[in-house]
C-alpha cells in the first residue's frame, strides 16, 4: 500500500554554467511529494490502525527534515564559489550549501536521502 503527501516551500537557487536564464539567481515555489510504501497497520490497539502511517506524522517528519531547512533559503551548490562567497558575506542569511547542483532532480535525490 502506498500513501502520498505533499508540502510546499519557497527557495532561491541558480544552476551555474546553465545555457539559459537558470544560471541567474532566482527562486521558486517548490512542491515536494513523498510517497510512503508499507503495510496497513492491523493492530486495533495501535493508533495508526487501518493506516500505513498517520499523515500528520509523515508531514511532520518531512517538515522537520526538509521544509524547515530549505524554506526561504538560498540553496547554493558547494562548488559555486562566487555565489557562495557572496552569500557568506551576508549577515543572518539563510543559506543551504548543497552537495549537488540544485536542480529539481538533485533536490529530490537529496530529499530522498535525508528521509531514509
Q: Each PLM stretch: what is its role?
A:
Residues 1-116:
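Charge-rich, low-complexity N-terminal segments
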